[in-house]
């Protein structure tokens, strides 16, 4: 049995949360596994060497069908398109207008916006993670291989996201930028452990899910910004969400090709990542004070409906439909069919679990937590 096809239910120890309510909400958002990766049985280089030929055979396809999803730099938006023009005589007035709009946003909104920005700023970790994947990594740092070109150019496009949000935070005057910057530095130094095992089958399942999750989160921060009267910030977050959707399309296409060429291996890889649960990129986030910072951020995101357990289930359901897993038959082993059935039934089970968690959370006493990002002001979690 090939290692890539082994479906493992990896053990995950629960994180001790500050309250019963927090524990339940975090469980609903599936963060217990995310902050407990130290207990995951580590596996490396799980793709059999012969599987690398699958990715070599896809290089022509990647060049013609994947790379066109990247935009030429001259056609891309840049952070300065949305921010006050520092060369303009109206700069101070534009900053004043930005700060006036920001004043109408509640503290809890800034918690999720800062959390999203910090997640984007850890981009060096994500490029590093993709370059751990066997068969698709950038072997020289400037390789012309289409997989390497994709990774570098994807990184360049993503780099604008944290950049624009960070500059907005700085100009808004609403957040403690030193604590935000410390959190970014801690997060990049901590890295991430998504459980992808240097295996591009697992890696591209992960990125397909994660890009959609990020698009959902940015789309919802756009919705909330508009509801609070900041149309410029709403356009900013919406533009970032559009980038994420385009990137999600690309990664989803890769998995489609894997299902075409190696349906059993791809199906087992999808089930493997679903068993492990998708680890959020910033799951090791902390600010030097709050070691449960990611759980607290995730709880606020859940409460504001920015990213919830229901969103997780919706993404699973979307990918099942996109990849046509319910009708996948040809090329599947018995284990592959069991993996397919598990994945296809997962969203419904997760929604039931989320409903139970939400009902229990409503009965718990509300609790406030201080966030260093907003000068230790308290927010309900």
From Swiss-Prot:
Protein family according to the UniProt entry: Belongs to the fatty acid desaturase type 2 family.
Entry binding sites for Fe cation 2: 158, 211, 244, 247
Cofactor(s) annotated in UniProt: Fe(2+)
UniProt cross-references to InterPro entries, sorted A to Z: Fatty_acid_desaturase-2, Ferritin-like_SF, RNR-like
A Pfam match: FA_desaturase_2
Highest taxon of source: Eukaryota
Enzyme class: oxidoreductase
Binding site for Fe cation 1: 120, 158, 161, 244
Catalyzed reactions: octadecanoyl-[ACP] + 2 reduced [2Fe-2S]-[ferredoxin] + O2 + 2 H(+) = (9Z)-octadecenoyl-[ACP] + 2 oxidized [2Fe-2S]-[ferredoxin] + 2 H2O
GO biological process, one term: fatty acid biosynthetic process
Alphabetical list of CDD domains matching this protein: Acyl_ACP_Desat
Enzyme Commission number(s) of this protein: 1.14.19.2
Key words of the record: Chloroplast, Fatty acid biosynthesis, Fatty acid metabolism, Iron, Lipid biosynthesis, Lipid metabolism, Metal-binding, Oxidoreductase, Plastid, Transit peptide
Protein name, entry field: Stearoyl-[acyl-carrier-protein] 9-desaturase 1, chloroplastic
Subunit text: Homodimer.
Source species of the chain: Oryza sativa subsp. japonica
Gene Ontology terms for molecular function: metal ion binding; stearoyl-[ACP] desaturase activity
